[in-house]
Every structure is written in structure tokens, then in C-alpha cells.
UniProtKB/Swiss-Prot annotation:
Phosphothreonine sites (modified residues): 92-93
UniProt record similarity statement: Belongs to the yippee family.
Compartments, record wording: Nucleus, Nucleolus
InterPro entries linked: Yippee, Yippee/Mis18/Cereblon, Yippee_fam
Record's GO cellular component terms: nucleolus
Keywords, in A-Z order: Metal-binding, Nucleus, Phosphoprotein, Zinc
One GO term of the biological process aspect: regulation of cell shape
Main location class: nucleus
Tissue: Detected in brain, spleen and testis.
GO MF annotations, alphabetized: metal ion binding
The protein's name: Protein yippee-like 4
Gene (UniProt): Ypel4
Residues that, per the record, bind Zn(2+): 31, 34, 87, 90
Length: 127
């Protein structure tokens, strides 16, 4: 019987490539462009976020993504230091990682990931 524990999520480093497959027993989200696994549904924090190009989900952890350099951006909720994230398989920009929030009320986002809905699809066990 396959294990449902894929282990810890890899660190988001721009110099390494990670190739992870999430167990079929988990509902997952995948890249709509290449179907690389991106996140388990269990890692979803909120569906109420806005990305650069539409609605987005906030995740606690993701797999198979790379990070660009961090930069400061003024977002709807204030100034943040963020790094764009991209699919390691097809290199499509998916959203961003919150590196630092400058307002106390936004600190919960630090280390979390935004993936835009237009770049992901539901996979495994959603029936």
C-alpha cells in the first residue's frame, strides 16, 4: 500500500530542481500547462486571494516550483517582499512566495505561496 506522506516540502531555492509526485490518495492541484503536481489540498489556506491576473489560492507549501529573486511590491494588502514562483517542469510563472510582510497584520503570509487559479487544475480524488 503506498504511503500518503510525501515527506517535507522542498525549500524554494532558485538553483535547484525538485521533481515530486504527490500520492494518489490526496486531492491535489497540478499545473494546467504540464500537469506537474503543485500542492495537496490539505495545504490550502485560503481561496480568497487576488493574483496579478485574477483569483488565486494561498498555500502553506508547494512542490515542483522554483523561485525568482525577492523584490518589494505594493500589493492590495500593503508592502511585501515577494519572489515569483514558476513551474519547474514547464517554467510558467504561477504566482509568488511571500518572503516578508511589513505590516503586523500580514505576517501570517510569510513563507506562504500564491498560485493563480488560471495556472492550476484539480487532480486525484475530487469525485
Amino acid at each position: 500500500m503506498p504511503s500518503c506522506d510525501p515527506g517535507p516540502a522542498p525549500a524554494c531555492l532558485p538553483t535547484k530542481t525538485f521533481r515530486s509526485y504527490l500520492p494518489r490518495c490526496h486531492r491535489t492541484y497540478s499545473c494546467v500547462h504540464c500537469r506537474a503536481h503543485l500542492a495537496k489540498h490539505d495545504e490550502l489556506i485560503s481561496k480568497s486571494f487576488q493574483g496579478s491576473h485574477g483569483r488565486a489560492y494561498l498555500f502553506n507549501s508547494v512542490v515542483n516550483v522554483g523561485c525568482g529573486p525577492a523584490e518589494q511590491r505594493l500589493l492590495l494588502t500593503g508592502l511585501h517582499s515577494v519572489a515569483d514562483i514558476f513551474c519547474e517542469s514547464c517554467k510558467t510563472t504561477l504566482g509568488w512566495k511571500y518572503e516578508q510582510a511589513f505590516e503586523t497584520s500580514q505576517k501570517y503570509k510569510e513563507g506562504k505561496y500564491i498560485i493563480e487559479m488560471s495556472h492550476m487544475v484539480k487532480d486525484n480524488g475530487w469525485d
